[in-house]
């Protein structure tokens, strides 16, 4: 399942930072790590390197976009909610974003996430409430928002995972650090030459 934007996406003069909401479930994991990996593959993040981000604010210029394929090995920022279940148990995970306006008229965007052992509807309601609290505590006016929630029931004697993510594939490029997808390697010969 995937979801993106409500069509009323935030605009910012600082440039664009594309992102999208995705969900996935896996109910047949041999263990929690196996279920987690299956969920990442299902969500399209199985071949990416992830930086899981905490905090409420999204990069300036956030814009909801349709999902895009990610190159193998790419470094991707994401706000990830992961909830586990075992042996017939149920788990839910959700992520939401909101485009906002400050009292001074500046545009920004925030994110909220949640994990529960409740059903889909209850989890979605709690997620929306968490998003409202984040808006209220910062005195922000909502312009538009979107949510993504998924629910899993683990198979008998197996682990299950419900995952929801806001994926921001280009946010790390915006930091001025250039290409963060490569690394510099020194061979032992190069290290000897520098010594």
Q: Each predicted region: which residue ranges?
A:
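Conserved small/polar residues in nucleotide/adenosyl-binding loops
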Residues: 186-191
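Helix-coil modules at protein/domain termini and other flexible surface or pore-lining loops
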Residues: 1-185
